[in-house]
Amino acid sequence: MLTAAGDDELDPVVGPESATEAATPRVLTIISHVMEKLVARNEWLAKQTKGFGKSLEAFHGVRAPSISIAKYLERIYKYTKCSPACFVVGYVYIDRLAHKHPGSLVVSLNVHRLLVTCVMIAAKILDDVHYNNEFYARVGGVSNADLNKMELELLFLLDFRVTVSFRVFESYCFHLEKEMQLNDAVSSLKDIQPMQESLSPASTLSSLYV
């Protein structure tokens, strides 16, 4: 399970080029800020309603990890080398979950596990080369068995709707850029590569989940 320890206490990941340092893409800063606001709002709602809902129980940890969302996303990016677009698409998945299951809240107990699961699935859809579940589990601080279960749970919660058209992708980029401008976080999302081909409406999951 994801520990409640700080980010410096998460197990170091040993893998091909795992120690290579790369500048953190701006989009990670924006998404972490948006997710922190969402979690703060939902924590307040949970206190009012005295519950988180049941749809996301598979993602709940025993307690909230102390590693921040920003540091957690940076860790995923550093070790998995997935493209920045994977984080945008992962955010799309979480937004779809929020709309499809409004009674189940993204809170501190589940946000980290949701993020690593969403980004991993997005990498399988978008990136030509990606690490397997076992590696993502080590990076995310969860067991391989738990990550496998969470992946399947997420796919069913989304009705396997994990393709994202370029138009939808672009609209989320504009939304994130607006958030950035409102909060003076960063200046642009230019580091996200064009995704017309890999995010085309014709994209399918036949090679992954059939």
From Swiss-Prot:
Q: Which Gene3D superfamilies match?
A: Cyclin-like (1.10.472.10)
Q: Which tissues and organs express this gene's product? A: Expressed in roots and flowers. Expressed in the shoot apex, leaf primordia and young leaves.
Keywords in alphabetical order: Cell cycle, Cell division, Cyclin
- InterPro entries given in the database record: Cyclin-like_sf, Cyclin_P/U, Cyclin_PHO80-like
Q: Does the keyword Thylakoid apply?
A: no
Q: Which cysteines are joined by disulfide bonds?
A: none
Q: Which Pfam families does UniProt cross-reference here?
A: Cyclin (PF08613)
Instruction: Look up the record and give one Gene Ontology term from the biological process aspect.
Output: cell division
The answer on whether this UniProt entry bears the keyword Cell cycle reads: yes
- GO molecular-function terms, A-Z: protein kinase binding
Protein family according to the UniProt entry: Belongs to the cyclin family. Cyclin U/P subfamily.
The record's note on quaternary structure and interaction partners says:
Interacts with CDKA-1.
Q: What name is this protein filed under?
A: Cyclin-U1-1
Q: What's the source species for this entry?
A: Arabidopsis thaliana (Mouse-ear cress)
* Gene designation per UniProt: CYCU1-1
